[in-house]
Every structure is written in C-alpha cells, then in structure tokens.
C-alpha cells in the first residue's frame, strides 16, 4: 500500500467517490456499455497470464452497476484436479476485513455501536501494557488501523495457532506496549479486525458468524459464503506455495481466533453480488445493507488509490501464504472486479499479484489500455535467489569439510592466502549478521518469515547459522594457535 497518499485518498478522493456512489449519479461522459468481446479479451488475458506464471487456478468476476459482465473459472482448484468454476470456494484472506467493516457500519447505523466510543466500552477486559493507551483506542481506530498495534503483533505465533482462544489471545496482547499513540499513525494489523469481530459479537448480542450470515450474506444471497473450515467444503480451492519459483500444494490452516480478520470463504459468483452493492446505493435486490442515516460504508482507511487523478480506482487485497485475492472498484465507471487465486506470487520476490491482475482486467472492462504481467522479474529474481542459496550451501559444506586440522593448513599458507582467508571469515560472519537482522528490512521477525516463507527462511537461516558458527570456530582456533606458537596472526 502507498502510505504517503493515504490521507489524500481518505480526505479528498474517497469522499467524492462516496458521494457519487451513494447518490447513484454517474458521469455521463463515461460509456455504460461493456467493450465488444469482453469475455474473449478477459479469457485471452487470463490464459496468457497463467501461461507465463505458475498459477494453478483462479476465478474472475466482473460487474458493471448491477449487471454481471463476466464470471469464469480457470485452471485447477486442488490436488484432486477439480476445475475452478464460479462456484469454487476460495479463502478470501484479508478481504474478510471488508465484510467485518460493513457489519460495524451496520451496527453504527442502528445505534448499537458508536465509532468514537472506546473499545473498552464493548470489551471491558481489553488491556495493553500501557493501561492509559488502552483506554484511548476507539472503534474507529480499529477500523482505520490507527490503534497503535503493530503489524508484527498481528502476526505473533499465538495468532497463528489453530487452538488459541480469543481470551488467550487477549491476555497475550495485554503484555504488548503500542508503538505510537492511538489515532495518530496508520499501521495495518490483523489485531484490529480480530477485536472488531468481538465488538460485533458484544454489541449485537449474537455470535459474529451468526450476525454476518443474517445481516450480510443472506441479504446478498451469498449462499456459498461461510466461516466454516475450508477443509470441510467439497471441491474447495487449496493453496499453492511458491517454493524456489515452483508452485507446490500447501494446506493452509484454518485459525478460528482470526476469523473476522481473514478466514471467510466465498466464491467468485457470491462476490459479484457483493460488488454490485457498491454501485447500487448499498442495496442488493431491494435489500438495504446500511441505514440511510448511518455513516458511509466506504470511508475506511484500507481502500487505496490505484489510478490517476482523473480516473480513480480503489482496491483491497487479501493473502495467506498460498492464497491471493483482490477486489478493484472504478466508481466513475461503476465497474468492479474480483480475483480469487490459489497461489501467491509476491511474498518473497516482487512478482505480479492479484492487485495487478484485477486492475488490468478492470481496464479491459472499461476499454482502457492494459498490460500483461511480466514474468521476467519473477523468474530472474528466483534464479538469483536460488543461485545465491546454492552457492552458500556449497561454501558452508566446503568450509565444514576443511575445518579439521584447519589451523595447521592456515599456518602453512602464504601471507596473501592468509589475508584472503580472513576476508572469507569476515564474509561468513557478515552473512550471519545480515541473516539475523534481515527480517527487519520487511518490518517483521523471523517467526513470521518462517511461517510465510519456510522454503526461503529455513535454508537461509540454516546457512547463516552454519557460516557464523564456522567463522567463530576459525577465529577461536586462530587465536589459540597464535598464542600457542607465538606466531603473527597474518
């Protein structure tokens, strides 16, 4: 996400778009008919994209106003070889948050939630290490990701466990000290929407899942949308992890404690129902999702600008280790796109994501120029990474094999070779140090990298630790031999 433009989006572009959507007005200059051969163009784009990149399967839905223009599945859904169809169930990952936000706005419209009230109004036991800070966080702070709870805290192991209860997670959060004052800075965190799920339960008097079914999924006729464990859904899409540039089946876990932040399952067909509500006054087939006197549904901070000043678009993506989903909205054209994909290409090497794919499909739908995703950066990036890891493995094995009687070999070498040997030792120790701090480059920790990219993290961490250990052993042996023989270290 482009954080620098977030405030501009929220305070200028988004309110303007909200007015357009809620009043139902459309700029007359924009054509209201789909381009000719839309399905053929989308099919060509998707098939070529899948040919270029290791994408096992995906589903696409395109709407214009209240009409579905294109709805199609491509490729394979799972290890059983089931084809992807518009009715294939996919984990939505963080797209779940958009539904949770809608539920909060519904309750705000009915007076059961006040966005400016403190979270402790609804969850009295909510605490942080800084008790004063905990009293300042509002429901709006959770919606807008301005609570001060960090991205890293939202990926802690206790939120990745299939057995953690909400009470256990809340007790763990009580030990956390927030990074910045509530309401002052945007930082995306799953914790915000975990808490909102509980706020919905407390304010509505119903379990979160029951409220969502009655007030969102049923009115939208989203009959295949569920919070049930995706493993229990026949024919559901299963994830595929990119391992060294190759797609490998991966069994994505179902984590009940984070259900309101990322564990809704839906289909492309159901999601087109959801998209049409964005362009029809918040209604679907005469069913109103929002109270007319309540706050708008669209003024939440997780929508981001992905267009140009004269052609605004908003989108939101979701992703687990092996799943990637996205919705794109072009309000001035009343065009919406949903992409559900059973792999994720951008977790390690910068590669095409569903953001890019959905954005280009939307441009096809409004008859704008578009680009096919490039695979050059993806495959060249993995080639470099795989080559580097292979070289480091060879170096570690070679150094370990020479470790026996290494001190004697060192003393028999020329001065130049000794200097080169020291350069090698320093290099090994630097690799070790870089590996230790590398996750900080992504503002994360090693346990998160190990969870999301074990194919990369395990060999890199192993290599780093081995080279560091070898370097320390050599330094120790050289020091001991120097003292023993009274010889200059070089």
Pin down the residues of each PLM region.
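Short, surface-exposed loop or secondary-structure junction motifs
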Residues: 78, 131-326
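Bacterial N-terminal signal peptides that target proteins for export
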Residues: 2-14
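Active-site SXXK
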Residues: 43, 60, 66, 88-119, ...
């Amino acid at each position: 996400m482009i954080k620098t433009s977030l405030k501009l989006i929220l305070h200028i572009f988004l309110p303007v778009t909200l007015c357009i959507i809620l009043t139902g007005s459309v700029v007359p200059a924009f054509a209201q008919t789909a381009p000719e051969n839309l399905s053929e163009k989308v099919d060509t784009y998707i098939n070529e994209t899948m040919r270029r990149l290791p994408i096992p399967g995906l589903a696409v839905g395109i709407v214009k106003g209240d009409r579905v223009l294109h709805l199609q599945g491509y490729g394979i859904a799972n290890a059983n070889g089931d084809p992807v169809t518009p009715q294939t169930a996919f984990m939505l990952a963080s797209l779940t948050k958009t539904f949770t936000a809608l539920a909060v706005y519904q309750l705000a419209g009915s007076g059961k939630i006040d966005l400016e009230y403190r979270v402790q109004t609804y969850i009295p036991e909510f605490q942080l290490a800084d008790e004063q800070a905990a009293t300042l966080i509002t429901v709006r702070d959770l919606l807008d990701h301005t609570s001060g709870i960090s991205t890293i805290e939202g990926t802690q192991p206790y939120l990745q466990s299939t057995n953690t209860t909400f009470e256990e997670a809340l007790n763990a959060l009580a030990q956390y000290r927030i990074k910045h004052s509530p309401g002052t800075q945007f930082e995306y965190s799953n914790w915000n929407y975990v808490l909102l799920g509980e706020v919905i339960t407390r304010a509505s008097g119903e379990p979160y899942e029951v409220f969502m079914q009655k007030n969102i999924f049923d009115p939208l006729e989203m009959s295949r949308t569920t919070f049930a464990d995706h493993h229990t859904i026949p024919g559901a899409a299963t994830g595929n992890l990119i391992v060294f540039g190759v797609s490998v089946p991966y069994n994505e876990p179902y984590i009940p404690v984070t259900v309101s932040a990322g564990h809704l399952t839906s289909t492309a067909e159901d999601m087109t129902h959801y998209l049409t509500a964005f362009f029809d006054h918040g209604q679907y087939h005469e069913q109103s999702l929002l109270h007319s006197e309540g706050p708008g549904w669209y003024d939440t901070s997780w929508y981001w600008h992905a267009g140009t000043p004269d052609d605004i678009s908003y989108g939101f993506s979701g992703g687990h280790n092996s799943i990637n989903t996205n919705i794109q909205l072009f309000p001035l054209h009343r065009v919406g796109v949903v992409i559900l994909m059973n792999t994720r290409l951008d977790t390690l090497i910068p590669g095409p994501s569903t953001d890019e794919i959905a954005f280009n499909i939307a441009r096809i739908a409004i008859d704008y120029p578009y680009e096919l995703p490039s695979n050059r950066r993806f495959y060249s990036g993995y080639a470099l990474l795989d080559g580097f890891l292979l070289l480091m493995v060879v170096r570690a094995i070679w150094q370990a094999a020479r470790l026996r009687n290494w001190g004697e070999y060192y003393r028999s070498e020329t001065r130049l070779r000794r200097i080169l040997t020291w350069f090698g030792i320093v290099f090994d120790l630097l690799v070790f140090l870089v590996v230790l701090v590398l996750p900080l480059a992504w503002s994360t920790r090693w346990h998160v990298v190990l969870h999301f990219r074990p194919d990369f993290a395990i060999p890199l961490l192993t290599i780093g630790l081995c080279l560091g250990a070898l370097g320390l052993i050599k330094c120790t042996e050289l020091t001991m031999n120097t003292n023993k023989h009274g010889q200059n270290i070089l």
